[in-house]
Amino acid sequence: MRDRAGLYAVGTLAVVLLFLGMQTVDDQGRFNPTRAPLPASFETGPGGERRIVLEAGPNGHFFFEGAANGAPIRFMVDTGASFVTLTESDARRAGINLARADYNVPFETANGRVYAAGATLDELRIGDALIENLAVAVVPDDRLGGSLFGVNGLNRFDRRETTRDRLILEVE
């Protein structure tokens, strides 16, 4: 009887670990702790202000899907990044011409120094919020795991509020 209970416990643990593992593996089988962040929700506040509400992903980061010059791009909010930063592939999808890009702007990151090219997004839409003429940095794909929504983008909102598991961006 004890052997059966032990086998049941091991089987249950294996199923739980398999489920948790599936939550952190992307469609190509690579480890990806940011696989399934909750989608942004959009609310209207008591004074008519529009709010974008982001729920923290499993790793504590905030993600959203934006439209950069009409192209869908997934961003991670990064208050340690001075600028909205696009990977080269995301910049190309957004229609940014990189033929004459000069990667001469140094940035210090957690992974060391990286050089970026400056560019401008004509528009970035997050739900019904529109940011126009946004300065961005473009970084080679192999130097950045995904596009970042930095402080210059956050500062375009009238108000922002952060708790441990929610980020609210407000437009009046």
Please name every model-derived segment.
Residues 1-74, 79-172:
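Pepsin/retropepsin-fold aspartyl endopeptidases
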